[in-house]
Amino acid sequence: MFVLNKFHNILHYKKIVPVVLLSCVSLIGCSNSNAQSEPPKQTNQANQIKQENTGNQSFAKLEKEYDAKLGIYALDTGTNQTIAYHSDDRFAFASTSKSLAAGALLRKNSLEALDQRITYTHEDLSNYNPITEKHVDTGMTLKELADASVRYSDSTAHNLILKQLGGPSEFEKILREMGDTVTTSERFEPELNEVHPGETHDTSTPEAIAKTLQSFTLGTALPIEKRELLVDWMKRNTTGDNLIRAGVPKGWEVADKTGAGSYGTRNDIAIIWPPNKKPIVLAILSNHDKEDAKYDDKLIADATKVVLNTLKATE
């Protein structure tokens, strides 16, 4: 649902009304013919509820069209409006967690420490290694591993980052310290992508993961130099062109991290910068009923369009 801070105007109205009535009674010229006021205009709150219902109907329509389940949470940081659809339901986070793990790495280490070189072997390579497989002989710095993990979704890079943090449980501990009591991390790649219905390991909710991403990129979880580094990696992500990026108008900036897993899981979490406006935090998670289901990136792009159109309608 949306959150709009309009109560100041309501309170101000309540203070003024008695004064107006008193003035009317005390004046002889206040006649019954002028007593009837114009019908009240639709309030912003009513318009908000109307747009929320419209958005929910549109999301449900997309779910039916793509035979999928959607989970959405969006926050316009300029207006504090929110959109929530299945926002408290758990979904496998898949590779979206790579952006959070990179944030945790930045939180735990100095920028100088990121120059530490990590060595690994062919046995350490995971299921998807577009960058790390090229550097087995030389190893990679922590900074290079974070770049590979976030921008190319390199699974070995993610695993090496998790090991540097102390394992999935220590990664989760860092999230707890930040106030995220929902997101769970138990396994490495590629196992973390296999989550069956009802399981909670390696999952989050749209609202929880969006707020944690916001803390890392826009909040106080990291000092500004580290925030800028994480945002830069996400802005230069190479895997998201067909997802949230495909659903925003031309000229808008997007920093995102995608993910995919079993049961047709397809996710994207992002910070979106409209021109001359404050950023929008957006998490779109999705899955299907069948374990071997195929995902369609267009679902995420279409859901993004609904989110942005709904936010625009309630401005």
Residue ranges and their predicted role:
Residues 160-218:
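Mid-domain, small-residue-enriched loop/turn segments at the edges of structured enzyme/sensor domains
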Residues 30-60, 64, 82, 163-164, ...:
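Structured C-terminal helix/loop/strand segments within mature extracytoplasmic catalytic/sensor domains
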Residues 68-90:
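Short, conserved catalytic-motif segment at the N-terminal edge
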Residues 111-135:
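Short, glycine/proline-biased beta-turn/loop segments that scaffold the active-site neighborhood
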Residues 2-5, 11-34:
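Sec-dependent N-terminal signal peptides of Gram-positive bacterial secreted proteins and lipoproteins
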Residues 126-161, 168:
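Conserved catalytic neighborhood of penicillin-recognizing serine enzymes
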Residues 80, 92-120, 282:
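Active-site SXXK
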Residues 65-69, 86-88, 96, 113-115, ...:
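Extracytoplasmic
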